[in-house]
Amino acid sequence: MKPSDARHIPVLGPEAVGLLAPRAGGIYVDGTFGAGGYTRLILETAGSRVIAIDRDPSAIAGGADLVTEAGGRLTLVQDRFSNLADVCAAQGAATVDGVVMDIGVSSMQLDQAERGFSFRFDGPLDMRMGRDGPSAADVVARASETDLANIIYIFGEERYSRHVARAIVAARSETPITTTKALADIVAKVVRAKPGEIHPATRTFQGLRIFVNEELDELHQALDAAERVLKPSGRLAVVSFHSLEDRIVKTFLAERSKTGGGSRHLPEVAQAAPSFTLLSKRPIVAGDAEVAANPRARSAKLRGAERTESPAHAAGDLPGWPTLASVMRAGR
């Protein structure tokens, strides 16, 4: 492949692709294509094929040149990565050799004011990765005060969530909250940040974004799907950027790699054989040089595992947190 003039360097890219260990003739899934950084590294490492998925139509359109460069080895599909098993089947790949995922919002999305992901720019309060379904403005306009507080607390880990929700409800009774600046200003009045701390609206924006895009449910389902499509010795590499995501990945891999070891004083309970073997006990984190070049890498954690020959475990139940459908239905 020809090198591109403008290359996107993904966080922990070489490390993630190193865990995948791509081989010639292998089929790999990039569940979160974004700007194509992981996909490009896989294509350059070996004569392999990549099926890349992204729910954002802008990402798919932006990958057209890379599709041409790849000469038939890259297929781009606009879809949610929770559907990766169906996507692979539609591409004639019942099983694959590796899956990589980079969880959360991309730098590209954060830098586009019109997407409404960041309070750094004033733009429409949107936050949708796929451009469909309710926007953040819709949630802010229609969710009850209790639901708003729960969303901001659970998904944003904001301890002042009730104060923020109360302020949002009071403000929207006066005028619709439709821009990122309007929401950030409302939050800043009730969440006081000390010098050197993150912007007071950071956690509220995170909570709304995760909720609007159903990111944690998507992650749960994507991990289950990856387990089903990976062939024996196939590898999974997941990069996460905050504790909510990493906790889900860590728990999933711990459960799937568990090898029994129950108490000898208790009755033996049937337990599914491990479907994964961990590639490292601790997450891989970015080095000082990468963090200096890309501050977003500071919070990144990479976890990897190799598929065993054992059958996939039954998909777990989703946690009982607020759902987009239920909140919007109640807010009518």
UniProtKB/Swiss-Prot annotation:
Family classification: Belongs to the methyltransferase superfamily. RsmH family.
EC number: 2.1.1.199
Record-annotated disulphide pairs: none
Species annotation: Rhodopseudomonas palustris (strain ATCC BAA-98 / CGA009)
Gene Ontology CC terms, in alphabetical order: cytoplasm
Originating gene: rsmH
PANTHER family assigned: 12S RRNA N4-METHYLCYTIDINE METHYLTRANSFERASE, S-ADENOSYL-METHYLTRANSFERASE MRAW
Alphabetized InterPro entries for the sequence: RsmH, SAM-dep_MeTrfase_MraW_recog, SAM-dependent_MTases_sf
Protein name: Ribosomal RNA small subunit methyltransferase H
Disordered as annotated region, ranges: 295-322
Chain positions recorded as S-adenosyl-L-methionine binding sites: 36-38, 54, 81, 102, 109
Catalytic activity of the protein: cytidine(1402) in 16S rRNA + S-adenosyl-L-methionine = N(4)-methylcytidine(1402) in 16S rRNA + S-adenosyl-L-homocysteine + H(+)
Classification via NCBIfam families: 16S rRNA (cytosine(1402)-N(4))-methyltransferase RsmH
